[in-house]
């Protein structure tokens, strides 16, 4: 193992130890949770730590007191702490980029235990992992393969009722991934409980040919922070994220960051 790789893992351990010593409850997500649930290992540029928004200030203060640079990158969902000896960082996540998937007590109540970097940890539950990943459909990133692999590995253990409750009125997004799962794994379609798929298809059938009433609204901004901006800016659709989940200023900062990353 290279010295650089050792330093990365040392940094991760230091962050975990600081948060543990500060009695700040956290969950591990991202690539490390994906590996825990599916066995699929991949290189990753960072560590994703999830916590309740109420614990964010304490977490950043503890890391800052230990000498690490910290920041609130986006006020509606993301903080960061940076290693002083490398370009490595840890994402500190308390919501999703679209404002929908807030980390709450249910995440912690259902978090499985494991180890990471030689430390006992809890991982984000598979249900909440699927829920959060389902809304990532950017041009440069799409988590559909992750969801297919999670369904393939964990479908028989999933709390499907809780997953349905998480998606709630966004059930069409879940149905889209279940449909794709049946396409990706045609010989293992039965892993998805028939009552789940039939229930979602009944909902879909009940809406065929029916428009929602009211001013035109675009829910595409829940899926991509940039690709549906034209609908809002030029075509007269209301951005469904505001003002309930994000302020207009948070939306603009989040969208501008996407444009900057593409340069």
Give residue spans per PLM region.
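Catalytic metal-binding acidic patch
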Residues: 30, 35-63, 125, 147
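Conserved catalytic core of two-metal-ion nucleotidyltransferases
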Residues: 64-105
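Helical scaffold of the NTase/Pol beta-like nucleotidyltransferase catalytic core
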Residues: 1-28
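Catalytic cores of NTP-dependent nucleotidyl/adenyl transfer enzymes across multiple folds
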Residues: 102-263
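Anion (oxyanion) recognition and catalysis
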Residues: 20, 64, 115
């Amino acid at each position: 193992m290279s010295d650089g790789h050792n330093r990365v893992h040392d940094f991760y351990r230091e962050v975990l130890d600081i948060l543990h010593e500060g009695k700040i409850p956290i969950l591990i997500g991202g690539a490390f949770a994906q590996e825990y649930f599916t066995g699929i290992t991949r290189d990753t540029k960072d560590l994703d730590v999830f916590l309740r928004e109420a614990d964010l200030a304490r977490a950043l203060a503890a890391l800052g007191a230990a000498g690490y640079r910290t920041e609130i990158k986006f006020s509606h969902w993301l903080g960061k702490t940076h290693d002083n000896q490398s370009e490595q960082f840890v994402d500190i996540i308390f919501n999703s980029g679209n404002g929908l998937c807030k980390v709450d007590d249910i995440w912690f109540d259902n978090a499985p235990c494991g180890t990471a970097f030689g430390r006992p940890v809890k991982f984000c539950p598979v249900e909440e992992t699927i829920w959060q990943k389902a809304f990532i459909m950017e041009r440069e990133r799409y988590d559909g393969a992750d969801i297919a692999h999670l369904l393939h590995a964990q479908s028989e253990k999933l709390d499907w009722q809780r997953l349905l409750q998480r998606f709630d009125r966004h059930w069409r997004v879940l149905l889209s991934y279940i449909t794709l799962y049946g396409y990706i794994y045609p010989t293992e379609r039965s892993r998805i409980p028939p009552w789940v798929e039939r229930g979602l298809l009944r909902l879909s059938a009940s809406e065929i040919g029916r428009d929602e009433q009211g001013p035109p609204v675009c829910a595409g901004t829940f899926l991509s922070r940039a690709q549906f901006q034209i609908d809002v800016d030029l075509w007269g659709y209301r951005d469904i994220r505001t003002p309930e989940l994000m302020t207009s200023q948070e939306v603009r900062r989040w969208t501008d960051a996407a444009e900057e990353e593409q340069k």
